[in-house]
């Protein structure tokens, strides 16, 4: 099992946290375990509540998501509830209004 540094940021929400996330743990779960107040609803990758935006680093594996289309995935949108890290990365949280 590999572990990666996942940085979650959102200036408006006061979030700037560096997490150690195992490759078998979702980014949302890791953030919640660290005490962050992150948005979520379905926890299955089929809504937009947990949407984030990849700012830098390795794109997470989110094969289980059903909301984003190929163009949105290519643009760096992330469903944190089903996103597993594949390398160090930085993700801006609370982006539901931007992805819609």
UniProtKB/Swiss-Prot annotation:
2Fe-2S ferredoxin-type domain sequence ranges: 4-97
Free-text cofactor note: Binds 1 [2Fe-2S] cluster.
Keyword Iron: yes
High-level lineage: Bacteria, Bacillati, Cyanobacteriota, Cyanophyceae, Oscillatoriophycideae
Iron is among the record's keywords: yes
Name of this chain's protein: Ferredoxin-2
Homology family: Belongs to the 2Fe2S plant-type ferredoxin family.
Swiss-Prot/TrEMBL keywords: 2Fe-2S, Electron transport, Iron, Iron-sulfur, Metal-binding, Transport
BP GO annotations: electron transport chain
GO molecular function, one term: electron transfer activity
Species annotation: Aphanothece sacrum
Ligand binding ([2Fe-2S] cluster): 42, 47, 50, 81
Gene3D superfamilies, alphabetized: 3.10.20.30
Transmembrane feature ranges: none
Cofactor(s) listed: [2Fe-2S] cluster
Role description: Ferredoxins are iron-sulfur proteins that transfer electrons in a wide variety of metabolic reactions.
């Amino acid at each position: 099992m590999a572990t990666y540094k996942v940085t979650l940021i959102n200036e408006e929400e006061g979030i700037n946290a560096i997490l150690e996330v195992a490759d078998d743990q979702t980014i949302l779960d890791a953030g919640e375990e660290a005490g962050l107040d992150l948005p979520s609803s379905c926890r299955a990758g089929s809504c937009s509540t947990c949407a984030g935006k990849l700012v830098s680093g390795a794109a997470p594996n989110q094969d289980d998501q059903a909301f984003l289309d190929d163009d949105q995935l290519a643009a760096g949108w992330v469903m944190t509830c089903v996103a597993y890290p594949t390398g160090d990365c930085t993700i801006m949280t609370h982006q539901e209004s931007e992805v819609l």
